[in-house]
């Protein structure tokens, strides 16, 4: 079961076009980081073909809109019924049977009281309840929106644990405006900066990339001697890559040996992870 963005292009504004072309394999978790919530909403609309775009979003080579996609606020519940009763009734509509004991356990795991009435829930509890339902429906493509400001740190922590425990082999998409330890459970990360894809790949590679600096130099002769004791990679013919923490020492060693430094740039300069980076 593969979720695929195939030659997807979407005009964000006059001079900005979002281009996506990647696959999410069976059971993989993808976190999409975007600094603008309206762009995340646009992606949700794209999944359901409620906005125009070029290319395709496919699940097992069929249009993803044919899948049973439930977003957290898509489904209504009865105000006067308990959370446990609401879940039983709603799941029966999808021919899904879950024991009362298991439903009770799931509710309590998310710090929700099975006997509470839906109308008495706080905003963050409503969000958790809807996320619980969308996971229990056992969708092939599960989309979790973490941008809701009502969610507390504790909420996001239990949601992350619940996703890891209950998502089975679903393709999970987590939408957020920052990278943090609650969405870094992902196998892959897509970073969209001001409407443009700035990174797609493994989280570990992204964090390493953010710490690397490229130095454009006049020549690369005798680098093995000049930079003895430092780890470096020849990126292009006259460009080397070093870790940011040794930049000053490396630059000094280069200049001392008559190798001119033309330009210094951070390899991850176009990748904005926004806030929360220190929480990883």
Residue spans for each PLM region:
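Q-loop/switch helix immediately C-terminal to the Walker
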Residues: 74-102
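Conserved ABC nucleotide-binding domain
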Residues: 100-125, 138
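Conserved catalytic loops of ABC-family nucleotide-binding domains
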Residues: 161-178
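C-terminal coupling/interaction segments
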Residues: 244-280
């Amino acid at each position: 079961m593969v979720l695929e963005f195939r030659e997807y292009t979407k005009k964000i504004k006059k001079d900005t076009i979002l281009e996506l072309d990647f696959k999410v394999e069976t059971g993989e978790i993808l976190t999409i980081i975007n600094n603008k919530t309206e762009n995340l909403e646009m992606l949700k609309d794209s999944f359901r073909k409620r906005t125009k775009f070029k290319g395709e979003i496919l699940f097992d080579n069929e249009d993803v809109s044919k899948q049973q996609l439930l977003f957290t606020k898509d489904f209504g519940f009865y105000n006067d019924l308990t959370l446990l009763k609401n879940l039983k009734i709603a799941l029966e509509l999808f021919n899904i049977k879950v024991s009362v004991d298991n439903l009770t356990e799931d509710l309590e795991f998310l710090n929700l009281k099975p006997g509470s009435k839906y109308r008495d829930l706080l905003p963050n509890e409503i969000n958790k309840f809807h996320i619980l339902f969308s996971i229990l429906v056992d969708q092939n493509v599960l989309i979790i929106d973490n941008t809701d400001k009502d969610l507390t740190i504790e909420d996001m922590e239990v949601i992350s644990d619940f996703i890891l425990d209950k998502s089975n082999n679903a393709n999970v998409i987590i939408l957020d405006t920052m990278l943090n330890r609650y969405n870094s459970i992902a196998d892959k990360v897509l970073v969209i900066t001001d409407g443009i894809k700035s990174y797609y790949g493994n989280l570990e590679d992204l964090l390493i990339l953010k710490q690397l600096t490229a130095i454009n130099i006049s020549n690369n002769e005798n680098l093995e001697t000049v930079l003895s004791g430092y780890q470096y990679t020849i990126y292009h013919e006259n460009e080397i890559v070093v870790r940011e923490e040794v930049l000053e020492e490396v630059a000094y060693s280069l200049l001392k040996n008559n190798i001119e430094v033309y330009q210094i740039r951070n390899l991850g300069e176009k990748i904005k992870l926004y806030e929360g980076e220190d929480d990883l």
